[in-house]
Amino acid sequence: MAQPSPSFPFLYRPMVVAALGAGLGIVFFRTLTGTGPLLALCLFSILGFACWIKGLLPLRTFCLAVVFALLRVALLPELSLPSSIMAPFVQAREALLHITGRLFPQQDGALLSAMLWGDKSQLDTSLRAAYQGAGVAHILALSGLHVSFVAMALNWLTRRVDIRLRLALTAMALFTYCAIAAFPASLLRATLMCLCPLSAQAMGKKKDQASSIAFAALCILFCAPSALWDIGFQLSFGAVIAIAMLAAPLTERLPFPRELSESISVSICGLLGTLPLSAYHFKELPLLSLFANLLILPLVPLAFLWSMTACFLGLLYYPLGDLMAPVGRLLLNGMNGAATAVAGFPLSLMEVPKPSLLSCFLFYGAMLVLSRFCLLPARKKALAAAGLFAAAFLLMV
């Protein structure tokens, strides 16, 4: 979509602007005291009406999103499915966790329970520390990585099916998976983002990655505004936003075969997108994350899909699942060994002082300026990004 005015320095995506406004509205409601939220509601209502009259579309959308977010948080409770609807999914989750534990030894079973079904309660502390130290803890959290494996399998199975039927089957399968995993924010985000391009294709529309990310955020925040404060929500969106902003141009500049360049650029951008949040929440940075991702990620889809298939077959007929399980154990041992080895390197995890929120926002602002969404000339983009990065790092010192 074209920008609404020559003076606006960014590509205008109504969904993105609405998501930013909604996020600010939720922050206002939580942080302002007394009559603060009411004053913010009145102020942004007036500003939104003024921008509407003046034809300032981005500002109008932003202000109205702030207003609707304030009203949403003030008037409605957080939404969740009734226990009567969730009961079958809870039973399915328990059955899958049980068969996972039967098919795989204790450590492997605990790892797969986290990777496949989102249950980290049995995960070994030392193994969790190894994945965190290697900078690949995202493998343990259900997210876009895992949805991409499921979607890839579904796409192959339904490759000869009409796109509308494929959309319906994929949506049903992915939302069932979300329900079994108890709707973690990162998995729900990935599911919605996966369905947006399919929906656009089914309707004959052009897909847009930025709008898909924003739509996923709006859906999650409408149902549960408190998700904005969830670390998993922040890390998930931080990574995918950075990938959307910088992965494509970085891929074009890397002198490697296309697939390798894409893997490297996605890993780099995912790392950049989570660096400020890792420093802010955990006061540490995984310095070897890029190397660990390139080493371990090729094993993950094989281990994930093979082990998931073994679990489903084990539910139907245990000997079949037991027959497949040894290959899954072998793949998991490779992942665990690689993560433990990388985490054992000196300085694999560096402790850093907690940055300020302003420093984090400046860091993300610099990435936004460097992205294709910023319409400034290349020289101005480079200077502005350098200034923002410098300010972000100076505030951390």
What spans do the regions from the language model cover?
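Short, Lys/Arg-rich, polar N-terminal cytosolic tail immediately upstream
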Residues: 1-9
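Histidine-/acidic- and/or cysteine-rich, low-complexity loops and terminal segments associated
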Residues: 8, 79-126
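Hydrophobic alpha-helical transmembrane segments in multi-pass membrane proteins
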Residues: 8-74, 128-290, 355-397
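Hydrophobic alpha-helical transmembrane segments
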Residues: 10-16, 85-91, 109, 116-121, 181-186, 342-363, ...
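Short amphipathic alpha-helical coupling elements at transmembrane boundaries
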Residues: 98-102, 114-117, 129, 156-159, ...
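Membrane-interfacial loop-to-helix junctions in multi-pass transporters
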Residues: 105-109, 123-125, 162-169, 299
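Alpha-helical transmembrane segments of multi-pass integral membrane proteins
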Residues: 243-347
